């Protein structure tokens, strides 16, 4: 009888173990199978009244006049808050012109509904300082909103941060007309928001628009939440060049949720460094544990892009999103002058319309081996696209070289209407199709 009871207990323990295993398998996990921390499940908005005293800029020498640049007075407000232990810098209703602003520890930015923090269109209002741009740690023009080494920095409110980028765009296209091979840095342009070496950052509800260059750039940051932002720049009648919505650059633990992005470049770009020895440079690095969910993408060059200034991206999860006018859903830029590894990237539960479903090709713009004799290799591994219902022009937009290696791709539960439905299975080693229908035909 004793042995019988022991047998029953053993069976129950095995059963419980299997149930727990199934429970873990059904929980939210990153593409590599690791459990998503509860931090990602918390999308509670910050109440700015709990962040300290409010410092309305109009109480500290700033006038409600949209025609004059008031950088000094606004910066003085930030500095006053810092001297008093911190607080929230408030942009009230009205339009306030400014050059580069530098936030200090324990200071925050809040733009009320009807308030506009508008960037100056004079590049001299953006000081040249140590910075990070296009995968390089160099001196460059400051952004409109700058935060360096500020843990807990927040931007809140239902107002607008406007880059006032029109003259910068015109200057860029004029230069490109004069020299079609000009680089993106030949025309001096400021970013809208640059956040560097800041942890526990949260941006919520704000509208970022009309940036002169990248709309928001996060470099060497951990634990960043970007919630319910609207990020826009025009693609017609004039194109706003290089106005990426969100650039993630050597960051870990990033949640992008509930955002609308429509820009004349990539919506979300994963960066991290470029060049033949980029992986040896301590200022470069990987992006890990990035979740993009419940977002909508209007016009953009790609909804999600790895590269081109990127060396290692891992555990990237994009889900439950709608794309209405993206040129590409997923773009893996294989840069032949940079060692790259893109791994454990999952795109799932997507609806809408794009030009190219998946786009993988060498990115040769400004190619430079800088004297390196051998070409570094680029790898993409464990890429999954599933539960997707899309209309597109091109289903399988891929071309690789001998220096690119694609392995372990899975396409599952895909329903595609495509003008060009051709595909070449030999491009990828370890390619799996599960219930993939293109123009009503099952692909195996």
Kindly give the residue locations of the regions a language model identified:
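Glycine-rich beta-solenoid repeat tracts in large extracellular/virion proteins
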Residues: 100-103, 116, 120-121, 143-148, ...
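A generic structural signal for short, solvent-exposed coil/turn residues
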Residues: 8, 49, 81-83, 101, ...
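Short charge-dense sequence patches
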Residues: 22-33, 106, 176-180, 209, ...
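Proline-rich low-complexity regions
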Residues: 37, 92, 378-379, 391-392
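Extracellular "leader-to-stem" segments immediately downstream of a signal peptide or signal-anchor
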Residues: 2-5, 12-90, 95-197, 202-204, ...
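Mature catalytic domains of secreted/periplasmic carbohydrate-active enzymes
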Residues: 130-132, 361, 387
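Right-handed parallel beta-helix
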Residues: 113-114, 151-160, 199-210, 222-235, ...
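Glycine-rich, flexible loop segments associated with nucleotide phosphate handling
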Residues: 51, 132-145, 182-191, 240-246, ...
């Amino acid at each position: 009888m004793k042995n019988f009871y022991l047998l029953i207990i053993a069976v129950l323990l095995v059963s419980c173990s299997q149930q727990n295993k199934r429970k873990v398998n059904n929980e939210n996990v990153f593409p590599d199978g690791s459990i998503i921390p509860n931090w990602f499940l918390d999308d509670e908005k910050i109440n700015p009244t709990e962040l300290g005293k409010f410092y309305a800029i109009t109480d500290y020498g700033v006038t409600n006049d949209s025609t004059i640049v008031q950088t000094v007075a606004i910066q003085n407000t930030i500095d006053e808050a810092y001297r008093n232990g911190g607080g929230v810098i408030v942009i009230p209703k009205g339009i306030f012109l400014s050059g580069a602003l530098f936030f200090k520890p324990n200071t925050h930015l809040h733009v009320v509904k009807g308030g506009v923090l508008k960037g100056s269109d004079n590049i001299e209002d953006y000081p040249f300082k140590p910075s990070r741009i296009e995968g390089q740690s160099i001196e460059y023009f400051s952004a409109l909103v700058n935060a360096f080494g500020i843990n807990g920095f927040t931007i809140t409110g239902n107002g607008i941060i406007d880059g006032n980028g029109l003259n910068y765009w015109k200057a860029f296209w004029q230069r490109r007309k004069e020299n079609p091979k000009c680089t993106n840095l030949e025309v001096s342009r400021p970013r809208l928001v640059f956040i560097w070496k800041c942890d526990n950052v949260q941006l919520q509800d704000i509208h970022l628009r009309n940036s002169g260059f990248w709309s928001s750039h996060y470099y060497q940051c951990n634990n960043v939440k970007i919630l319910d932002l609207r990020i826009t720049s025009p693609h017609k009648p004039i194109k706003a060049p290089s106005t990426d919505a969100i650039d993630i650059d050597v960051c870990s633990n990033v949640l992008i949720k509930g955002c609308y992005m429509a820009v004349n470049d990539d919506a979300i770009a994963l960066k991290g460094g470029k060049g033949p020895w980029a992986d040896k440079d301590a200022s470069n690095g990987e992006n890990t544990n990035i979740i993009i969910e419940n977002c909508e993408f209007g016009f953009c060059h790609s909804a999600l892009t790895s590269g081109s200034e990127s060396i290692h991206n891992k555990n990237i999860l994009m889900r439950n999103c709608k794309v209405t006018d993206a040129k590409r859903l997923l773009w893996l830029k294989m840069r032949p002058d940079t060692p790259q590894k893109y791994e454990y990237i999952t795109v799932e539960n997507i609806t809408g319309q794009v030009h190219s479903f998946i786009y993988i090709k060498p990115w040769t713009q400004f190619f430079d081996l800088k004297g390196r004799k051998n070409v570094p290799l680029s790898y993409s591994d464990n890429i999954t696209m599933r539960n997707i219902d899309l209309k597109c022009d091109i289903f399988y937009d891929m071309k690789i070289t001998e220096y690119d290696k694609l392995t372990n791709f899975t396409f599952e539960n895909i329903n595609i209407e495509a003008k060009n439905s051709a595909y070449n299975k030999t491009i990828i080693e370890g390619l799996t199709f599960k219930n993939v229908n293109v123009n009503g035909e099952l692909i195996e």
